[in-house]
């Protein structure tokens, strides 16, 4: 059963409401990260709590908000535009793929808002809150990235690598009232939603296979949900006292749909492959399995399948016909493995 309470659900839906697209551009200035202050406006990439942690994806120099245009610039004059919808484009070169379409993103947003994956959001939020509560506290002055020598500063940064619409990131931030968040993705339609997923979340267009546009040791918690893992970069940006939370499917995930729809099965070696991708950089700290029974309509089944790798490996026409033949509603198992990885 989901542990997302009705109050938390209302809070998540409320913070997902859009903000005005035109927001004042802040000029980056030194910020005292040891003394929390009230949030006076929704966070975006120009906010001091975020921009202090960002780095130029070209030269790795610090970034600051430009005063003449809506952009971030580094001392070497590399410039990165802020979209009207609130995210910053920190992509260099062509994206490896364009990600989900606007229609796919809209369907995914509706699916998540219906609570079908609350089992994942809740597990991430509870694990992140527990982890930060027990991690080392502040010690010493903060670095330029906002972190202290043995702690995370007053505004711990939560990064979601492959964030999609930012739904899971928003759930984690709702459980961490002093944290700020950054959603990274290559899909612009998803980032338009991620940029307004939570008042304390910013969003950036970035390829997580490349160097991440973040300072060393800048991140307290790094989320990775059904997304590729860049072990080298994850280790570089994660604070030594931080945690990487990785969510992967178990072999029971969507098992009721695999044969009837001809979906890809979860690789039996999935756990080993995840460990290999992080080997030498992280050590597994704990693993928990989270399961929920979903009751879905046919359209929701189509959305769910479209959120996974089978969407790229199954004939669309045959898949649509198989979904139409399903009895409605459909009962499906969601089963995921959440592993906490510690930096070595």
PLM region descriptions:
Residues 51-52, 289-344:
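Conserved Class I S-adenosyl-L-methionine
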Residues 97-123, 127, 131:
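Class I SAM-dependent methyltransferase Rossmann-like catalytic core
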Residues 210-221:
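A short acidic, Gly/Pro-enriched loop at the edge of an enzyme's catalytic core
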Residues 4-5, 9-12, 18, 35-98:
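N-terminal auxiliary segments of SAM/dcSAM-dependent transferases
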Residues 156-211:
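Class I SAM-dependent methyltransferase SAM/SAH-binding core
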Residues 8-46, 129-157:
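Intrinsically disordered, low-complexity terminal tails and inter-domain linkers enriched
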Residues 243-275:
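Conserved class I S-adenosyl-L-methionine
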Residues 231-245:
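A short glycine-rich, Lys/Arg-flanked "PGG" loop and its adjoining helix->strand segment in the class I
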């Amino acid at each position: 059963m989901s542990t997302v309470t009705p109050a938390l659900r209302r809070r998540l839906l409320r913070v997902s409401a859009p903000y005005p697209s035109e927001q004042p551009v802040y000029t980056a200035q030194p910020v005292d990260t040891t003394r929390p202050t009230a949030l006076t406006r929704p966070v975006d990439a120009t906010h001091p709590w975020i921009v202090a942690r960002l780095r130029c994806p070209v030269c790795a120099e610090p970034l600051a908000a430009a005063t003449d245009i809506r952009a971030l610039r580094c001392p070497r004059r590399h410039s990165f535009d802020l979209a009207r919808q609130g995210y910053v484009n920190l992509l260099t070169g062509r994206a490896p793929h364009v990600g989900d379409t606007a229609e796919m993103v809209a369907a995914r947003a509706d699916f998540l808002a219906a609570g079908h994956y609350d089992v994942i959001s809740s597990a991430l939020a509870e694990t992140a809150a527990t982890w930060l509560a027990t991690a080392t506290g502040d010690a010493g002055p903060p670095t330029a990235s906002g972190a202290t020598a043995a702690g995370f500063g007053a505004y711990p940064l939560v990064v979601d690598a492959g964030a999609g619409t930012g739904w899971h990131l928003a759930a984690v931030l709702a459980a961490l009232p002093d944290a700020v968040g950054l959603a990274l993705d290559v899909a612009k339609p998803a980032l338009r939603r991620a940029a307004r997923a939570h008042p304390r979340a910013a969003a950036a267009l970035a390829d997580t296979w490349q160097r991440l546009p973040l300072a060393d040791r800048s991140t307290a918690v790094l989320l990775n949900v059904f997304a590729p893992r860049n072990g080298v970069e994850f280790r570089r940006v994660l604070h030594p006292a931080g945690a990487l939370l990785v969510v992967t499917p178990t072999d029971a995930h969507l098992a009721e749909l695999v044969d009837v729809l001809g979906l890809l099965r979860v690789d039996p070696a999935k756990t080993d492959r995840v460990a290999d991708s992080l080997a030498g950089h992280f050590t597994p700290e704990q693993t928990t399995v989270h399961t929920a029974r979903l009751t879905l309509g046919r359209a929701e089944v189509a959305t769910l399948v479209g959120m996974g790798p089978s969407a790229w490996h199954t004939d669309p026409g045959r898949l649509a016909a198989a979904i139409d033949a399903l009895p409605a509603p459909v009962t499906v198992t969601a089963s995921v493995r959440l592993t906490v990885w510690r930096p070595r």
